[in-house]
Regions:
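Thiolate-centered catalytic microenvironments shared by cysteine-dependent enzyme domains
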Residues: 3-4, 60-148
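Positively charged, proline/Ser/Thr-rich regional signature most characteristic
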Residues: 2-80
């Protein structure tokens, strides 16, 4: 399985049918203890602060290009990857990742509708084994239209 075309908002049942596609990367932005207890099979964990700049007094801006490229590469994102993001807090963290990807020039992404709670409540499979991502090479190519 290699070709994957998912909508911007993906339903849990659609995502479950898509597990196993070569270019799919599921990114969990839940709290670390939640990830250790349960996550979608194959999902890599990303700590939310890694996609935020930490320069005082401007906390929360985008990290610099080199940092952003390193972080996204380290979790397995390249230009061919379709990212599905979710969290356990209403989608804010996952949505921030998708906006960050858009700003960085990567438009292949989806948000899991309802996040981890919808996935679990609908009885889809869960895992507690950590996933080690395959490192890829991500290059930031600014999409100036995406800046707020």
């Amino acid at each position: 399985m290699s070709e994957l075309d998912l909508p911007l908002i993906v339903e849990p049942e659609t995502l479950e049918k898509s597990l196993g596609y070569d270019n799919l990367l599921i990114v969990d932005l839940s709290k670390a203890d939640t990830y250790r207890k349960m996550h979608i099979p194959g999902a890599v964990h990303l700590e939310y602060p890694q996609i935020l700049g930490a320069e005082k007094p401007k906390m929360g801006l985008l990290p610099d290009d080199a940092t952003l490229a390193r972080v996204l590469s380290s979790i397995g994102i390249d230009e061919h990857t379709h990212v599905v993001a979710y969290d356990d807090e209403g989608g804010g963290r996952a949505s921030r990742l998708l906006w960050t990807l858009e700003v960085a020039g990567h438009g292949r992404y989806s948000l899991l509708n309802g996040g981890l709670h919808a996935w679990a409540n609908e009885g889809h499979p869960l895992d507690d084994a950590p996933v080690t991502p395959g490192v890829r090479t991500f290059t930031v190519q600014h999409n100036n239209a995406a800046y707020a």
